[in-house]
Amino acid sequence: MNMQNIRNIAIIAHVDHGKTTLVDKMLLAGNLFRENQQTGELMLDNNELERERGITILSKNVSINYKNTKINIIDTPGHSDFGGEVERVLNMADGCILLVDAFEGPMPQTRFVLQKALEIGLKPIVVVNKVDKPNCRPEEVYEMVFDLMCDLNATEDQLDFPVVYGSAKNNWMGEDWKTPTGDICYLLDQILEHIPAPEQLEGTPQMLITSLDYSNYTGRIAVGRVHRGTLKEGMNITICHRDGSKEKTKIKELHTFTGMGRQKIQEVSSGDICAIVGLEHFEIGDTICDFENPEPLPTISIDEPTMSMLFTINDSPFFGKEGKYCTSRHINDRLEKELEKNLALRVAFQEGYTDRWVVSGRGVLHLSVLIETMRREGYELQVGQPQVIFKEIDGVKCEPIEELTINVPEQFSSKTIDMVTRRKGEMVSMETQGDRVNIEFNIPSRGIIGLRTNVLTASQGEAIMAHRYKEYQPYKGEISRRSNGVMIALESGTAFAYAINNLQDRGKFFIEPQDAVYAGQIVGEHIHENDLVVNVTKSKQLTNMRASGSDEKARIVPATIFSLEEALEYIREDEYVEVTPKSMRMRKIILDHTERKRANRD
C-alpha cells in the first residue's frame, strides 16, 4: 500500500456527543457491511459495560477504504479518568476530528483530550454534530471551539481548521447546517484533503507499542504504528524495554486492521497501524527495532495514579454464595492480568497481608469500572473507602487538585457553591448562559468523593458535573465527610416489613422487606450523627388473642438503591462495600458489635 493512501485519525468527543455513532456511519459509508448484513448500533462499544454507561473505556481501532485511501479511525475514551489510554492512542494519529454537540458545545473532558492532541501537533477537523436537535446553536458552538483552541495555545496552522456540520444519527454531513445532504461523504473528503498523510521514513524498522490486545489462542498482541522502515512476517527484531534492557525475538505474524477485524499480511510499511503476534515479554511504551542496531523511540509518559482503594477477599457471612471466584489467589491473578493492559493502574499487597491489595488508579470512575467488570466475570470481593494519594514535594505534604465544572440552573447556584466551598473548593469563574450557570472550581480530589450525589440531590438532578486532574498542591486541611450515622443490622436473618415499618422514623433504609441481612451489615442511614444498631429481623407475634389482619398494614418507603460509585463514595473508613455478581452490600469492617465498640473506644 502506498503511503500517500493512508490517513490516521483520532476522534475526540465528550461522553454522549455521538462519537461512536459517527464511527458507525463512517463504517457504513466505507461499505464495510454487505448490503444485507444486519448491523448493530454502537459497533465500537462492544464491551457490555460500555454500552450500559454510554462511555468508551478502551480505545478501538477500525479502518475504512474510501476513494482508494485507507482511513484508520482511532476511537479515544472521552473521560479524563482514562487519561492513560488517551495519550498513548493519540501517538498513533496524524490528525483528529473534534466532535461537539451543537447545543452543549465543548465540555471540560473534551478539553483534556484536545489539549493532549494539540501538544502532539495533530491537525484538527471540527464536526458540529446533532444540528437536528431543537434549540441548537451551531454558530455559537463554533465560536466556543475557536476560543477553546486559542486558550490551549494552538498554532496558526491548527487554528485554520475546516468545520463540518451534520447529524450522525440521520447520516448526513455538510458545510452548512441549514441544508442537510444525503450522506457523510463531505466529512470523508475533508479528511483526505486536510489531514496529512503519514511521513514515509526509510531506514531500519521502528515501532512504538501503544496498546495491547489479548487473544486466548496466541496470547498478548502488540499494537502500534510503524514509525520507520518496514516490518515483515518472520523477521528477527529487538525489543527495547522502557528500562533500557534489550531482548532479541522474532515476529510470528503481522496483522493490519480492516473494517472491524484484522487481516494477516506479509509486510507493513511505515505510517500504517498493525498488530504483531508472537512476542512474549513486552510492555506498552517499548520499541520494536532492528535486530542488528536497535534505536529505541522515546517512551510515552503516563499520568501517575491519584487515588487508591483497598481490595480484599469477601469474608462476610454470605461468602461464596453468589460468585464463582472468591479466593485470594483468584483475585490476585485477575488483578495481575488487568495490569497488563490497564496502564494507569498500580497494584501492591497491603503490608503484612497476602489477601489485601492496595489498588491505585486515576479516579473513582477508573477503579469502579474495574470492580464492575470483575463483578460481572463472577468475582466476589470487598472494597474499602477510596483514598487520595498524597505526595511529599520539597518537604510539604501535597494532594491532587482537580478542575471541576458544574452547570446548574440559576436558582440552585448558591447551594452548589456552598457545597463545593465547604469541601475546600475555590471558585475560579462563573458565567450565566440563559437560565443556567456554569461555575468552575479548583477542588482537592478528596472533596470530589461523594460530591456528585449531593449536588444532584440539591439541584433536583439537573446538574452536569465534570472534573479533571490538574496538579499537586499543598494539603488543604480536613474535609468533613458524610455527617449522618448509619443503621446496622443486629442479627442475621430475613428483614421483615413489620420491623422496618416501626423503624422508619429513625432514618431511611437501603434494604427491602424479605432481603437477607447479616449482623454488622449497613441497612440504612440514621437521622443523627451516631450509628444505631437496629433489629430488622423481628416479625410480628401472632396469637389467638389478636386477629392477624386487624392492625394497620405496614406502609414502607421504597429503599434507596446505590450504584457502585455512590456506594464507594458513601462509606467511611471503618466500612467496606461487598461486591458480588448478584448484589452489593455495605458493611462495617468489624461485624461483631461488642468488638466494634471496643475498637472505637481505643
Please tell me what each predicted stretch does.
Residues 257, 262-265, 398, 443, ...:
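Long insertion/accessory domains within large nucleic-acid-processing enzymes
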Residues 227-353, 376, 558:
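Catalytic P-loop NTP-binding/switch module of NTPases
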Residues 150-284, 288, 404-409, 442, ...:
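Conserved catalytic-core segments of large NTP-driven translation/proteostasis enzymes
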Residues 96-158:
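Conserved C-terminal guanine-recognition region of P-loop GTPase G domains, centered on the G4
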Residues 17, 29, 33, 79-80, ...:
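Conserved nucleotide-binding/hydrolysis micro-motifs of P-loop NTPases
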